[in-house]
């Protein structure tokens, strides 16, 4: 990484320090999640395009169609597994750099396919899988990197902004797909696929001169480098009081968590007791599972096909309506930026679940008569579904695992949650075409299935998911200690535990039997909370 000190001895990266440097890191994070969203949406307009099916006729088979789309999720799953095993060893910066390179290689392989040769389809599938590996690497790393380089008070908002950019990326993909339908046949699918390189290249170039996570450096004993980066993130000289204090805070947190060489054993994920590592792992990973089983990617990946097969529109109109739907998706995704702290995570989960369930009920109910006029109601249901999803379930499963898991297991638990996301993503994307074509219900059986899934999720969220809004990460640890020690529901424990200042958290931790070097970190000062960098979000 390249930095230059100014005349005051403050390190600069890309000519920026302090807030400016944090903005550059945010730009990288949002660009990568734009790419994430673009990848999710790009195949939706291509997979049923005549120009694509002429070049790759195998996708006319529903099972093969599902495989071509879902193989991307397999790649993402493999990328997340890679980070689960090697992320702490490689570091945040190198992981992101590697992910961007892998994605570019995958794109090149896809657009270099030359139909109608026998191996063209296989080459396209391999390239799509490799692109997914790169995306899996980055989506498992970027949220952690941004959190570790950001201020604690805007942790939730920043991760929700990342989620909002998934919707915006999908919007861009839909409209590029639609515009390319008016070009020559090879352009219809080659250009939308190739456009992914733009986002990946921005990430790649910017990461060349952006810093590593100071928290990761400290877990690996690279103290001087970490101090330089903290100084740059603060916009202060290395020997300033704030930088020195933050260094001490991070080092104490790492020691308290039992990090040795930056490694946490997998066995730590499965412990209970006052820390409830396993329960918290399940809460985070199951939120990703429920996001996928709610039907989101059945709608995002296959919106044009849903319209063509279930409602009877032609391909161009289906693409146009898909683009309009993605505008709605993007608009409502931005509402989470402002609602996540005011309304809370738990209430947003519940509101989204009810809205998504009713939207799917509307869609399958409107398709039962099998008439063109009634099927228009199904379109309304898909529009309302994506609005509720964008405002609630899109960002929350990325935020909740980052908050709910404790310092000691957070990196591995977050990677496990991402693995869960891509595993269930593959399952849903694979079975959706078969469900649409093979249920013999004019498509309404597909929507009935997702309505039932959302109905099941409501009591799970209501009874098992505690609220984390407005809590420091230390207070969230105390919620689980209170629930375990006092034998009560963790949802109730979250409601009963009062808001605390740092010294109160310390006293309560002692009451529950946590020592200064146990699993909980309780030694932040008020000035550290105000300064923000590398306090709550440092772990």
Region locations from a protein language model:
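Alpha-helical transmembrane bundle of multi-pass membrane proteins
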Residues: 1-234, 248, 254-539
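Short intracellular "coupling" helices and adjacent cytoplasmic loop segments at the cytosolic face
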Residues: 232-244
């Amino acid at each position: 990484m390249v930095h230059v000190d100014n005349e005051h001895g403050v390190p600069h990266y890309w000519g920026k320090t302090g807030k400016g440097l944090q903005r550059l890191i945010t730009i990288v994070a949002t660009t990568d999640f734009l790419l994430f969203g673009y990848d999710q949406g790009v195949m939706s307009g291509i997979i049923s395009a005549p120009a694509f099916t002429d070049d790759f006729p195998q996708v006319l088979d529903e099972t093969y169609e599902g495989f071509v789309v879902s193989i991307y999720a397999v790649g993402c799953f493999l990328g997340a597994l890679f980070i689960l095993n090697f992320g702490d060893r490689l570091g945040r910066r190198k992981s992101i750099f590697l992910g961007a390179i892998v994605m570019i290689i995958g794109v090149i392989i896809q657009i270099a396919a030359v139909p109608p040769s026998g191996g063209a389809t296989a080459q396209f599938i391999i390239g799509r899988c490799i692109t997914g590996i790169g995306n899996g690497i980055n989506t498992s790393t970027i949220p952690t990197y941004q959190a570790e380089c950001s201020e604690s008070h805007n942790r939730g908002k920043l991760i929700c902004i990342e989620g909002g950019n998934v919707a915006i990326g999908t919007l861009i993909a839909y409209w590029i797909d639609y515009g390319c339908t008016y070009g020559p046949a090879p352009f219809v699918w080659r250009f939308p696929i190739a456009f992914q390189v733009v986002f990946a290249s921005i990430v790649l170039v910017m990461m060349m001169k952006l810093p590593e996570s100071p928290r990761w450096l400290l877990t690996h004993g690279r103290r001087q480098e970490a101090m330089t980066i903290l100084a740059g993130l603060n916009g202060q000289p290395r020997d300033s009081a704030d930088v020195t204090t933050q260094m001490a805070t991070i080092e104490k947190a790492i020691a308290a968590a039992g990090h040795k060489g930056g490694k946490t054993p997998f066995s730590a994920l499965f412990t209970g007791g006052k820390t409830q590592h396993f329960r918290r792992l399940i809460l985070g990973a199951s939120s990703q599972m429920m996001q996928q089983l709610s039907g989101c990617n059945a709608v995002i990946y296959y919106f044009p096909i849903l319209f063509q097969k279930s409602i009877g529109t032609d391909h161009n109109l289906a693409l146009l309506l898909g683009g309009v739907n993605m505008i709605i998706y993007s608009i409502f995704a931005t509402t989470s930026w402002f609602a996540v702290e005011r309304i809370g995570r738990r209430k947003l989960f519940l509101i989204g679940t009810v809205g998504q369930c009713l939207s799917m009920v509307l869609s399958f109910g409107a398709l039962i008569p099998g008439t063109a006029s009634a099927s228009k109601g199904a379109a309304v249901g898909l529009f309302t579904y994506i609005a509720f999803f964008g405002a609630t379930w899109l960002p929350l499963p990325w935020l909740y695992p980052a908050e709910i898991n404790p310092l000691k297991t957070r990196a591995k638990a977050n990677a496990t949650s991402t693995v869960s996301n891509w595993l269930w993503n593959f399952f849903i994307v694979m079975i959706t075409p078969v469900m649409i074509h093979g249920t013999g219900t004019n498509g309404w059986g597909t929507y009935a299935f997702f309505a039932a899934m959302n109905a099941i999720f409501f009591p799970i969220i209501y009874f098992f998911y505690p609220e984390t809004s407005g809590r420091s990460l230390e207070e969230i640890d105390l919620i689980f200690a209170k629930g375990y020690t006092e034998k009560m529901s963790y949802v109730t424990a979250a409601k009963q535990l009062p808001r605390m200042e740092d010294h109160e958290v310390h006293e309560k931790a002692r009451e529950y039997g946590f020592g200064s070097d146990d699993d909980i970190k309780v030694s932040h000062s008020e000035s550290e909370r105000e300064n923000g960098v590398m306090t709550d979000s440092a772990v």
